[in-house]
């Protein structure tokens, strides 16, 4: 925790990943709920639930690409901006009339965004290692992992609550 308070590079990287985790957690739970409202909902919910598997299966390849990237900071910024643009497109598209075809487009956007997120996370790990002294690295990584896990759990619950509170108004997300 001390590293978070005194090291601006570490704090920036952690905050960036936490914001990414918040967005992903909110979106993932809302997307499964959205899938349950389209035609052929059993298949849609199954596909939405399984969509997280594709980026996980590709994570080794994505990690290698991230390791080989020469301008990690530039790629990380580009990755996060690309994710933001994808989510803006998604916010527009999700407001259109529901159909299974539209759901598949949204699913593809979700998978691409998750792959980009994995790439961005892979880029940030070496930056994290360079921004924290070796003696503080274990505690910094512990806080990093614990924070991300906690944020994901909390915001999945918040996402489910908010979507009900917003009367299933998906474009608000």
Where are these regions (language model features)?
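Extracellular/periplasmic helix-loop-helix junction of adjacent transmembrane segments
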Residues: 27-54
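Helix-to-coil boundary motifs at intracellular loop junctions of multi-pass secondary transporters
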Residues: 34-38, 68-69, 127-132
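Transmembrane alpha-helix termini and helix-breaking/packing motifs in multi-pass membrane transporters
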Residues: 32-38, 91-97, 154-173
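Substrate-agnostic recognition of the 12-TM MFS/MFS-like secondary transporter fold
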Residues: 12-28, 51-64, 73-85, 105-164
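A helix-boundary/kink motif common to multi-pass secondary transporters
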Residues: 40-41, 70-74, 102, 133, ...
């Amino acid at each position: 925790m001390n590293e978070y308070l005194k090291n601006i590079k570490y704090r920036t990287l952690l905050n960036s990943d936490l914001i990414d985790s918040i967005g992903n957690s909110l979106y993932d739970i809302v997307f499964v709920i959205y899938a349950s409202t389209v035609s052929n909902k059993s298949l849609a919910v199954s596909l939405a639930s399984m969509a997280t598997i594709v980026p996980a299966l590709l994570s080794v390849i994505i990690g290698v690409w991230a390791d080989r990237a020469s301008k990690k900071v530039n790629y990380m910024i580009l990755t996060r901006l690309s994710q933001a643009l994808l989510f803006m497109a998604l916010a527009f598209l999700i407001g259109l009339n529901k159909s299974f075809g539209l759901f598949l487009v949204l699913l593809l956007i979700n998978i691409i965004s998750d792959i980009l997120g994995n790439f961005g996370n892979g880029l940030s790990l070496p930056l994290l290692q360079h921004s924290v002294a070796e003696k503080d690295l274990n505690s910094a990584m512990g806080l990093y992992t614990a924070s991300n896990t906690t944020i994901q759990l909390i915001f999945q619950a918040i996402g489910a609550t908010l979507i009900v509170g917003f009367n299933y108004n998906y474009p608000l997300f």
